[in-house]
């Protein structure tokens, strides 16, 4: 079927005059007859052929119920094409005095699938009715830009062929073991205090992808991106949930597990809870930034060398503001500090007991049930090996309470500043009179 998109401001086809501030007419600084002269702005250009965004979905599915409905399977595969996306159009000559108009200039393609498998049964166990159910779900989707006005191939915005969520950055090959080792590596075209950055023992070994002997980011365009490559993707992949429950002799147990099988996240330079003192010298030292997790350098000679290379340290030589300069050595995304933000979480576990009817009758009750429930009690993520300061479930969600956005631009980086999912334990009783 085909649908429109209602999530767009109405009356976009009308040329409207706007003014700064909340008033429809602004006040200028020019005073005539004791009054500020009002003014408004010239309306932006609007294409003549603005129309609805259109979403067309093709779907094929399979449903199976086997063994008297004890085993159920559902599978779906879909393709969704979004056309006439309302976005910015081609640039206009500056002499025209108007910004590029918005119109139906882009399109998007999405492919995805969903699977679910359920198993349920009931029988007598120890002379008492016993029942259980297990349901697992797994789903995935990917989206690509199929049309977008980006004549220069600028990587800081959308472009034709882009997969939503992709992260561009540098490849790395470990850490330099000595100054002599670093001198044999490519020069860094990262300007710090106006000078070419030089690598030392304990710094990251960046990979010279284009082989020109210098680490650069080019013009950050498709045709000239220097040594930048796609190193990851922040979109959640292979999302899943497992729901289990059982009941026997008045005792009930249920669990819900949920997670993401694949997702990348890169900590932005202002993510102080990740970078610690690598961001600013007065920041706290994170507990994972101690011991053999950090390079140890022998500076007794001019040829500095790392003394704990056999421990495979994760954190490079500590350089103040290394991750907080416009062109510092750790400012640009790289696969060494790219975080695996996949996770599995116990969303809920509940244990309950329903009292027998004869006990309820003695208490003059219709029903009595007590329960103990916990939420978000357990979470595991590969990211916790390097930092446990972030909640992987909401790491890209963002909170309006934080001034800085959780994500920065289109490159999948971000502060990760989101309120974590709270752990809660509830003890309750249900009474029916």
Where are these regions (language model features)?
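Extracellular/periplasmic, surface-exposed regions of secreted and cell-surface proteins
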Residues: 1-171, 329, 333-433
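Conserved small-residue
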Residues: 4-12, 122-234, 265, 272-313, ...
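Short, glycine/acidic-rich beta->alpha junctions
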Residues: 42, 53-58, 223-226, 232-243
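A short beta-strand motif that forms part of the nucleic acid-binding face
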Residues: 79, 90, 257-261, 270-271
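Conserved SET/PR-domain catalytic core that frames the SAM/AdoMet-binding pocket
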Residues: 135, 225-226, 236-250, 347-352, ...
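Glycine-rich, aromatic-lined ligand/substrate-binding cores of catalytic
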Residues: 231-268
């Amino acid at each position: 079927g085909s649908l429109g998109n209602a999530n767009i401001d109405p009356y976009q086809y009308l040329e409207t005059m706007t003014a700064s501030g909340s008033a429809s007419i602004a006040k200028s600084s020019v005073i005539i007859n004791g009054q500020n002269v009002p003014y408004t702005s010239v309306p932006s250009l609007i294409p003549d052929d603005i129309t609805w965004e259109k979403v067309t979905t093709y779907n094929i599915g399979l449903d199976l119920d086997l063994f008297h409905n004890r085993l159920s399977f559902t599978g779906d595969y879909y393709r969704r094409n979004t056309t006439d996306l309302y976005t910015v159009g081609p640039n206009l000559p500056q002499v025209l005095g108007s910004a590029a108009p918005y119109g139906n200039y882009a399109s998007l393609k999405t492919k995805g699938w969903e699977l679910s498998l359920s198993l349920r049964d009931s029988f007598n166990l120890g002379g008492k009715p016993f029942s259980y159910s297990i349901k697992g779900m797994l789903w995935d989707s990917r989206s690509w830009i199929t049309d977008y006005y980006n004549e220069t191939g600028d990587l800081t915005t959308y472009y034709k062929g882009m997969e939503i969520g992709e992260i561009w950055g540098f490849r790395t090959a470990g850490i330099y073991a000595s100054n002599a080792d670093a001198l044999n590596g490519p020069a860094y075209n990262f300007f710090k205090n106006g000078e070419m950055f030089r690598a030392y023992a304990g710094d990251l070994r960046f990979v010279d992808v284009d082989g020109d002997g210098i680490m650069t980011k080019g013009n950050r365009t498709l045709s000239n991106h220097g040594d930048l490559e796609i190193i990851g993707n922040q979109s959640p992949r292979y999302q899943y949930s497992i729901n289990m429950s059982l009941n026997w002799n008045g005792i009930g147990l249920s669990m819900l597990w949920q997670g993401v099988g694949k997702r990348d996240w890169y900590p932005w330079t202002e993510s102080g809870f990740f970078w610690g003192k690598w961001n600013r010298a007065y920041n706290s030292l994170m507990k994972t930034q101690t011991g053999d997790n950090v390079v140890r350098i022998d500076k007794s000679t001019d040829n500095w060398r790392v003394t704990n290379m056999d421990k495979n340290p994760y954190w490079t030589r500590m350089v103040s503001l290394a991750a907080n300069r416009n062109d510092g050595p750790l400012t640009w995304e790289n696969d060494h500090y790219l975080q695996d933000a996949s996770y599995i979480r116990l969303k809920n576990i509940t244990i309950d007991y329903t009292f027998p009817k004869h006990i309820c009758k003695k208490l003059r009750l219709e029903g009595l049930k007590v329960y103990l429930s916990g939420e978000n009690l357990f979470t595991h993520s590969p990211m916790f090996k390097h930092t446990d300061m972030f909640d992987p479930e909401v790491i890209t969600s963002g909170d309006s309470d934080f001034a800085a956005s959780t994500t920065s631009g289109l490159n999948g980086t971000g502060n990760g500043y989101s309120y974590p999912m709270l752990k809660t334990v509830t003890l309750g009783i249900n009474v029916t009179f």
